[in-house]
């Protein structure tokens, strides 16, 4: 597959790309988890100007459709009262955090895509993403502009080492643990579906409690005779909770998740092992 490196904020660089495209899968974007410090101009330059350049590329080259990755930051605040997040929930997000302009920029990108859909007939498929779980050798991200270990990677590391693991807050709070390979399945189906548009939550439609998440990590990654002890800490803050309603994706795309939580962890472990075999380090035996 040919690879082109393009700065999407520079419209002139799009001349590098082929002009006989059927579909554009737009996963480009600036996000808080990958931003050192806080530079809101990046969100405007990349998520708005950059995506406008992508839309113009689609228009000029008569692309049939665009697939776009939206953040679930526009509705995730509903989850604290009712974890089931429907696709059609009105936007609701905080205006007081360093995520605000990020969420606004992604919302505006979605609105720009709708404009090109209605004005030029560009078919559009929007995918609202929560955390997508996958193995990567990069196990850090940024919180409030400061680099930290990704939470679930820290828990997996403790399970591998057989170290005690604390369960913070209400252990029954649930999260939709969607694997990257199921997200890819959804994208693939949208590439060829006979529809003009769609708006989909990415997920499994199933919630896994925090306690079951940690038990699963211990079962899959812990060594026999060296399993982590679980320490309940209800005095600590609660984890976020949400379940993505995937009904439209099931009905319109024929999407069906292939990985439940434990199957995801098992495949995650295989990917870690392959990374080590291929010379990527000493993650896990």
What are these regions, as identified by a protein language model?
Residues 80-83, 114-174, 180-185, 189, ...:
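NAD(P)-dependent short-chain dehydrogenase/reductase
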Residues 22, 41, 45-52, 60, ...:
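Conserved internal alpha-helix in NAD(P)-dependent oxidoreductase domains
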Residues 31-34, 72-79, 130-133:
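Active-site segment of SDR-like NAD(P)-dependent oxidoreductases
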Residues 52-101:
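Conserved Rossmann-fold NAD(P)-dependent oxidoreductase catalytic core, especially the SDR/UDP-sugar
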Residues 101, 105-108:
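Active-site helix of classical SDR
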Residues 159-285:
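C-terminal substrate-binding subdomain of Rossmann-fold SDR/epimerase-dehydratase oxidoreductases
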Residues 24-28, 66-72, 127-129:
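SDR active-site strand-loop-helix element
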Residues 8-46, 77:
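NAD(P)H-binding glycine-rich loop region in Rossmannoid oxidoreductase-like domains
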């Amino acid at each position: 597959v040919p690879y082109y490196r393009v700065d999407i904020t520079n419209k002139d660089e799009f001349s590098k790309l082929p002009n006989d495209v059927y579909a554009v899968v737009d996963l480009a974007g600036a996000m808080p988890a990958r931003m050192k410090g806080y530079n809101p101009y990046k969100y405007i330059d990349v998520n708005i100007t950059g995506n406008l350049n992508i839309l113009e590329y689609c228009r000029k080259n008569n692309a049939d459709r665009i697939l776009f990755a939206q953040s679930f930051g526009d509705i995730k605040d509903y989850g604290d009262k009712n974890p089931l997040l429907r696709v059609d929930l009105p936007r609701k997000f905080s205006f007081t955090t360093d995520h605000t302009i990020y969420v606004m920029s992604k919302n505006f990108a979605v609105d720009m895509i709708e404009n090109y859909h209605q004005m030029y007939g560009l078919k559009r498929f929007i995918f609202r993403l929560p955390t997508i779980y996958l193995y990567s050798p990069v196990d850090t991200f940024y919180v409030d502009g400061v680099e930290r270990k990704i939470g679930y990677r820290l828990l997996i590391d403790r399970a591998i080492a057989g170290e005690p693991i604390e369960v913070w807050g209400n252990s029954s709070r649930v999260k939709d643990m969607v694997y990257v390979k199921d997200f890819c399945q959804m994208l693939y189906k949208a590439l060829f579906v006979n529809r003009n548009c769609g708006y989909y939550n990415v997920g499994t439609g199933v919630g896994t409690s925090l306690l079951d998440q940690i038990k699963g990590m211990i079962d899959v990654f812990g060594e026999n005779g060296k399993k982590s002890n679980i320490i309940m800490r209800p005095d600590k803050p609660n984890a976020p909770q949400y379940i993505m309603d995937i009904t439209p994706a099931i009905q319109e795309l024929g999407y069906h998740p292939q990985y439940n939580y434990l199957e995801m962890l098992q495949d995650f472990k295989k990917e870690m092992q392959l990374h080590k075999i291929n010379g990527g380090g000493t993650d896990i035996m």
